[in-house]
Every structure is written in structure tokens, then in C-alpha cells.
Amino acid sequence: MTHVINLDGEHLTLEDVIAVARHGATCEIDQEAKKAVEASRKIVDDIVREKRVVYGVTTGFGSLCNVSISPEDTTQLQENLIRTHSSGYGDPLPEDAVRAIMLIRINSLVKGYSGIRLSTVEKLLELLNKGVVPYIPEKGSLGASGDLAPLAHMVLPMLGLGRAYYQGQLLSGQEALDKAGIEKIALAAKEGLALINGTTVLTGIGALATYDAIQLLKLSDVAGALSMEVHNGITSPFEEDLHTIRPQSGQLATARNIRNLLEGSGNTTVATQQRVQDPYTLRCIPQIHGASKDSIAYVKTKVEIEINSVTDNPIITKEGHVISGGNFHGEPMAQPFDFLGIAISEIGNVSERRVERLVNSQLSKLPSFLVKHPGLNSGFMITQYACASLASENKVLSHPASVDSIPSCENQEDFVSMGTTAARKAAEILKNSRRIVATEIMAACQALDLKPENHELGKGTKPAYDLFRQHVRFIEFDKDIEIYEELNKASELIENEEFLAAVEKAVDLSIQF
């Protein structure tokens, strides 16, 4: 990919994060930003030379902030920080999450408030651009004082330590550098702290989940519209006049999306043609999906502020003042990421209920569990169970992490955000809900093929159905079928964005009005 993203600490977007994290876009540091980094570094060098007392530069860390460090030990202090703080647990974060983390950290550092050397920032950028991905365990951060443990793991390979992925192989940090043609570095005063003291890990994980949630919201409208086709849904609940008198942006956008998707459909009905009202899971799609759209639009705004923010401590102002504060505290993102998880969970919840309506013969008027010979075959019976399991798990995961705090560091850090847990939970809820929505689409397509009278599909539902059928076949449920294979195909189709792109060629879909 030839696209190069200019990093100035001010203009990074969520789409830029995705381009770097998932599509191999490279980055360069803005020329003015380089000057700001160098000016900030000069102030740190002056502090060390003048033996001034500044937290994390000439003192210990956390509750050890009153321990003075001699100028000759300031470099060792920083390496010790990385070695001792790299205490994460669990499985490694996905490579796209780590690349997002590296990018966001660089963008924060180039604002010029952290006192780091330009050469050190460029070293982290070199790892990113050349595809060296540090091995970062997923657990171990309190989300204050920043994401210390996981970010320490990010820094280890820069020193020739730790582990990293390169070209799909997990290697020692030094071996990864050697294969990529990168020289290791030694940290100078304040640099270890500048690299690890911030909300970067929780923001990186949450940024990817936010982007994926936006795509899922559009997919959920497609799924809901396909269910409407199956059930001969009543279209009046989506009329614009109904929603302009309650002008919630997400609700308005959802109603418009459904109208666009169903335009020209021969399957939809009007009130009293078959029944007076549809159930809430169809009739209230704008209100339910729309609420989640509004929540996620808010989270996106918070993410784009955070990826262009300084979350270091202490910070060094342009005038040379050193300020110890709390910008590393993850609470401003912990609450939004809890909110994100709840919003996504609701999409999974309502989609699972529509799956039940599709497979329930009393509700769909189709063969039980969408199979031609129910009894001999169980059809989609256990598929609905699986969706219910995922929806139920989401409800547990939706308990907010940000309401919890355990004091740490001898009670110096006595109130923490647990924001990284919130971000990780939101990402897991996203995976579960995406599976449920994929299953709804699969079940709706199966149901459409079983309908005795199936008329022309809508402007948006037809390309959705057509592309889906190119990848996932109608299931006869004979002895040759293993349904998990088709379920996996369905999930893979919507995860790679090809499915949504095909629908959006036909109709405009949005999350805000």
C-alpha cells in the first residue's frame, strides 16, 4: 500500500488507524512535529545537567517518587523501568491491535510534550513501518498510570529484548530486529517513562472495536431488513414522518437505512394487510439500532480526541515548564468503552431474537428450524442455541469495568480506571455480536429460499442476498452437511467487509442522520 500518513499529533483519524493497523499503510513524522520533539528533549537534557528534581527523570516512579536518582543513573533508571514493568499476562494481543498501539503512541509523542529524543520516536516508527510487531500480553493493565505493563512489552524489542513477530514468525526481540535490519537503542533520561506512561493500549484496542462496531451497525440494519423480507414486515414504522417528531440522530439514520434497503421490495406489507402491528424486534429496529448508533458515534468522537492527545506524565510545556498531572488516567476512555460494549451487546441481543423468530415455525410460518424435513433433521435448532449463548455471554461482559478500582503502588495510585479491561471486553462483545448478526443473515437467506411465495427483494436486500448466496449455499441438511462450515463462511464474509461494500454500492448506509 503506497498511502503514507503524516503524523503531526493533531490530525490522526480512526480511518488512519485502520489503514496502518490492518492494511499496511506507512507513516512519516511531520517536519514541524520533529522540531517540537527536539525542543522538548533539550529541556530534559537541561534538567539532567542542572540536577533538578523532576518526577521520572531524576526520581523513582510511583510511590518511589521521593527517591532521588543521580545524573549518571538516569539512563539505567529508564531501562530498569522497562524490564520491571514488562509484567503482563495472558495471550498476545492481535497484531492489528499492536500496530494501532504503536501508531497512537508515536502520534502522541510527536506533539512534543514528552521530552523524548527524536531518534527514539523514529526507532519505534521504524519498527512499525518495517513490520516488527512486539509481543504484548493482553492482560496486566489498570488503565492508570496508563498502560504500563503492556507498553513496557512494546518497548522491549526496541532494546533487543522481549519477543516480537516478524513476517508471521514469533522471534526474540533481537532476532526480529536483525531480520528487519533495525539497530537496537539505549534509552536516555525520561524516555522509558515517555514510552509507557499513557492510555495507548486501551485506546488502540478500543479504536479497532469502535471501527468494527460502526460496520456491525450497518450490517445489523441489513440483517434486520432481510428479516423484514422474510416476515412480510410492515413498512410504516420506518416512515420519515414518524421519526422526525422524535429526532434522535441514530433513529433517523436507521429508519432511512431500512427504507433504502427495502425500496422496491415485493415482500413488505402495510398495516392491516396481514396484521396490524409487527413485534418490537422488527417494528422498533430504528429505536433499538439507533440508540446503539448514537452511543457509538459518541465513542468515535472520544477516540479521535484521545488518539491526538498527550497522555504522558510529567509533560513539558512549550515554555519549558514541567507539570506533573494525571493525563495518563484512563477514566475518560474507560467509561466510553464500557458504553461501547453495552451498545454492541444490544445489537447482538435483538439480532438473536430475530434469529429465534426465523427458526420458530409458529412465528415464521415456515418449516421448523428452516429445514425441509424437520424431525429427520434439526436444521438451525442448535444454531439458535449458539446465538443465545453468545448473547448471554455478552450480558455478563457488559458489566462495566470502569466502576471498579483497586488501589495500587502503596496507595499512591489509589483510584484506577480499569479502562483496558473495558476495551478488551468491548472487543470480545463485538466478536460475539458479529457472529450473531452473520447467523441472522444466514438464517434469513435460508428462510427466503423456503418461502412459498417469494417476490422481488429490495434495492439493498437483493445484492445482500445475491452475494451471500455466492459464498454460502442453501442448506439441504442432508448427510453431507456440517453446518459449522457454512456458519464460518458466513462470518468470514461479513468480517472482510466485502459483503457490506456490495450493499453500499446499491444503497447509502449511515450511522448518523
Curated annotation (Swiss-Prot):
- EC number(s) stated in the UniProt entry for this protein: 4.3.1.3
Pathway involvement? Answer: Amino-acid degradation; L-histidine degradation into L-glutamate; N-formimidoyl-L-glutamate from L-histidine: step 1/3
Any one cellular-component term (Gene Ontology)? cytoplasm
Keyword set, alphabetical order: Cytoplasm, Histidine metabolism, Lyase
> What GO terms describe the biological role, i.e. biological process, of this protein?
L-histidine catabolic process to glutamate and formamide; L-histidine catabolic process to glutamate and formate
Subcellular localization, per the record? Cytoplasm
User: Mind telling me which InterPro entries this protein's record contains?
Assistant: Aromatic_Lyase, Fumarase/histidase_N, HutH, L-Aspartase-like, Phe/His_NH3-lyase_AS
Disulfide linkages recorded for this protein, renumbered to the chain, are: none
Task: Report the residues modified as 2,3-didehydroalanine (Ser).
Answer: S145
Give the reaction(s) catalysed: L-histidine = trans-urocanate + NH4(+)
Mod. after translation: Contains an active site 4-methylidene-imidazol-5-one (MIO), which is formed autocatalytically by cyclization and dehydration of residues Ala-Ser-Gly.
A molecular function annotated in GO for this UniProt entry is:
histidine ammonia-lyase activity
Q: Where is this cross-link: 5-imidazolinone (Ala-Gly)?
A: A144-G146
The lineage's top-level taxon is Bacteria
A Pfam match: Lyase_aromatic
Q: Which family does it belong to?
A: Belongs to the PAL/histidase family.
Can you say what this protein is called? Histidine ammonia-lyase
